[in-house]
């Protein structure tokens, strides 16, 4: 019957779960791949207690974020490029998205890249301010190519919550002892507040 279908999700929460492949050392990727994926799984658990919010959210786990050689138009972001192509015909269904990447650093400093959608940036900062963690969310002047890039390119405004000031990035030192449960709590709480008070209101 016309009008009988339930409305689909309108907001994306994303992470990549792959890790960089190195021939010369064992790369664990505790922060770069692991932290954001763990956070997204916890967001799923939390949203399960809030069905009115949960039905509006789609969780997306990307593979192939890392480049085999060097990031380019043809290397890296394989999963998000594919996903963006799949949803492009129905892109207006989605009001926006959050990408989590490298969010577990003990010395947390989420640096929003220059391509962050302006209104989303303001609302994320307002959410962080409300939770008294605004000092851990700042701007970055560094252009970052990440899984949010293909989504922004098709017109789904997506913000990259990333701590790129992380010295063990792409080294053997990216291990779980560098991570903090408190940092994950901060990012998850800000995202949840943003969903409830801004994105899905």
PLM feature segments, named:
Residues 1-5, 83-90, 148-150:
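Short amphipathic alpha-helices and their capping/turn segments at secondary-structure boundaries
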Residues 1-26, 49:
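Soluble metallo-hydrolase cores and metallopeptidase-like ectodomains found primarily
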Residues 6-17, 55, 98, 159-161:
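Short coil-to-beta-strand
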Residues 16-20, 64-65, 103, 164-167:
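Short connector loops/turns at beta-strand edges and beta->alpha or beta->beta junctions
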Residues 20-24, 68-69, 167-172:
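Short acidic/His/Gly/Ser-rich catalytic and metal-binding motifs that mark active-site loops
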Residues 24-126, 132, 140-143:
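Acidic/histidine-rich catalytic neighborhood of metal-dependent amide-processing enzymes
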Residues 96, 105-201:
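Active-site-adjacent substrate-binding region
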């Amino acid at each position: 019957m016309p009008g009988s279908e339930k409305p689909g999700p309108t907001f994306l929460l994303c992470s990549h779960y792959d890790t960089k492949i190195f021939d010369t050392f064992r790369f664990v990727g505790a922060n770069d791949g692991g932290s954001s994926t763990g956070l997204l799984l916890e967001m799923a658990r939390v949203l399960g207690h809030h069905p009115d919010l949960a039905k509006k959210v789609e969780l997306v786990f990307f593979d192939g974020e890392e480049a085999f050689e060097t990031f380019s138009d043809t290397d890296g972001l394989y999963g998000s490029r594919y996903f963006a192509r799949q949803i492009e015909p129905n892109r207006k269904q989605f009001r926006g998205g959050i990408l989590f990447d490298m969010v577990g650093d003990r010395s947390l400093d989420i640096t929003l890249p220059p391509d962050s959608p302006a209104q989303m940036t303001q609302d994320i900062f307002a959410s962080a301010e409300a939770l008294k963690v605004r000092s851990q969310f700042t701007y970055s002047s560094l252009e970052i190519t990440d899984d949010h890039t293909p989504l922004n390119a098709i017109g789904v405004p997506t913000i990259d919550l990333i701590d790129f000031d992380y010295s063990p990035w792409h080294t053997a030192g990216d291990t779980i002892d560098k991570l903090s449960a408190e940092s994950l709590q901060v990012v998850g709480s800000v995202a949840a507040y943003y969903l409830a008070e801004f994105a899905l209101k």
